[in-house]
Amino acid sequence: MKVSLLAVLLLSIVAATYGQGECGSNPCENGSVCRDGEGTYICECQMGYDGQNCDRFTGANCGYNIFESTGVIESPNYPANYNNRADCLYLVRIKGARVITFTIEDFATEIFKDAVEYGVGPVADFNQALATFEGNLTANNQVPPPFSVQGEQAWFIFSTDRNIPRKGFRITFSSDGDDCTPNPCLNGATCVDQVNDYQCICAPGFTGDNCETDIDECASAPCRNGGACVDQVNGYTCNCIPGFNGVNCENNINECASIPCLNGGICVDGINQFACTCLPGYTGILCETDINECASSPCQNGGSCTDAVNRYTCDCRAGFTGSNCETNINECASSPCLNGGSCLDGVDGYVCQCLPNYTGTHCEISLDACASLPCQNGGVCTNVGGDYVCECLPGYTGINCEIDINECASLPCQNGGECINGIAMYICQCRQGYAGVNCEEVGFCDLEGVWFNECNDQITIIKTSTGMMLGDHMTFTERELGVAAPTVMVGYPSNNYDFPSFGITVVRDNGRTTTSWTGQCHLCDGQEVLYTTWIESSMVSTCEEIKRANKVGQDKWTRYEQSFAPQPDA
């Protein structure tokens, strides 16, 4: 088999650049495969893992992952009955997909017991499910129409109890990506994406499915009078033979059209030539020669004469003016001498005779430089030769002591204290609970503000004038996604204590879960810390599930994000 030099070169380029894309840093974990995209990547996880980088162990005991553009999702053993106590996870990840459409072809599960939930994104979380399906939908003619999700990633969770298994479900899917990436259209064409197809809208001058063909505008022989046609993009150019011009060489050239005759001369056109009839006062082939009126040397006092048509202009030397440069200019007319100095006029110049204690070309320099009191803000002026030096009071700087030194520039106030600049001093206005010249002394623990626990969940506490504490709560996942379930937080602290105890309750998802924290605010190694005990209560549907409805645990909250501890759901 023969391999072209171009193919070898392309393979070399691919080999040299492989691994320099988004997958170059090997972001995918736990044996997953990284698929590079334009500015992004997608991880094809091994069974039992999900998350953007396949870094989250799901604990699923059935299901599978699909990475093709079309496929089928079926319950275990389908069409035979599925197993009891199944906990299945199906990941659908299709690189480059913009829309994934799912069609339920068959569905039969035990209603209120065995449910299928689906959602989008890298993490399968039933709290983020878009819909839930359960029951014998096929037999009851309740199969929903096809539904679609945006993006490259979707997930399905199927869980069963220990009673009455059924045959389960069969769901097919297909995806539509961006068929315009990479752009197949050539020569500046615009690509319009369609469903698993594209259309090229060609730039003027091109045709073909991919606009690969340049239209030959010379095919119609547009050039006349022997002109040679040169094809261009969306146009053509005619190279005319001598004597003709125009877009199509349709015009006989008029040699007088460029108005070659100067100074009002009249042009008479000929064949490839012309002749000029000159006005009086001009001569030459193009009437280019003017009669010289400067021949009589009319300009005086060394002025330079410039000839014009039937006239002349004198360019006078410095110090003279007039039509023929006959007048000496009086440079003292503008009174240039300052501070009472006398002006003596000369030729193109003047001399100032200064009064005592003044000097300079215009008598502008006072020999007593401190006479004008240049030093500001109490600075002391000292004459130094013809200049002065200002000795500034403490707190000021600058040539004239005009700058107030900002003692707050070094940010001396600690722990959020506000710095107020003074003259050669500063004052720190400390936040409540802090003292000292620089607010360096901590006196108590303040509940108000933002706190982070070991999982980097976040609570924000606001204390009202009545003593009640309000605020909100966001999980780390919600912070990462920028979307949070609606929450209501309320609580009360113990009053008039430096290290208060407190209790707060957060209601999430319109009452679906309620979490209560109790604890006390401490100062540990100079840092504010909340140590809390929590209990979480979740709404459930059955008596069996109520055994798992309550969870308890402990949290340590700090003012800064902490290193990750194990996640509760992992």
Swiss-Prot record:
Task of the protein: Forms the apical lamina, a component of the extracellular matrix.
Residue stretches in coiled coil: none
Quaternary structure, from the entry: Homotetramer.
Ranges for domain CUB: 62-175
Molecular-function annotations in GO: biotin binding; calcium ion binding
Principal cellular location given in the protein's record: secreted
CDD domains assigned: CUB, EGF_CA
Note: Expressed both maternally and zygotically.
Domain EGF-like residues, every copy: 18-55, 176-212, 214-250, 252-288, 290-326, 328-364, 366-402, 404-440
S-S bridge residues: C23-C34, C28-C43, C45-C54, C62-C88, C180-C191, C185-C200, C202-C211, C218-C229, C223-C238, C240-C249, C256-C267, C261-C276, C278-C287, C294-C305, C299-C314, C316-C325, C332-C343, C337-C352, C354-C363, C370-C381, C375-C390, C392-C401, C408-C419, C413-C428, C430-C439, C445-C521
Glycosylation sites: N30, N136, N357
Signal peptide: 1-17
A Pfam entry, by short name: Avidin
UniProt subcellular location: Secreted, Extracellular space
Protein name according to UniProt: Fibropellin-3
CC per GO annotation: extracellular region
Organism: Strongylocentrotus purpuratus (Purple sea urchin)
Domain Avidin-like: from-to ranges: 443-562
Keywords: Calcium, Disulfide bond, EGF-like domain, Glycoprotein, Repeat, Secreted, Signal
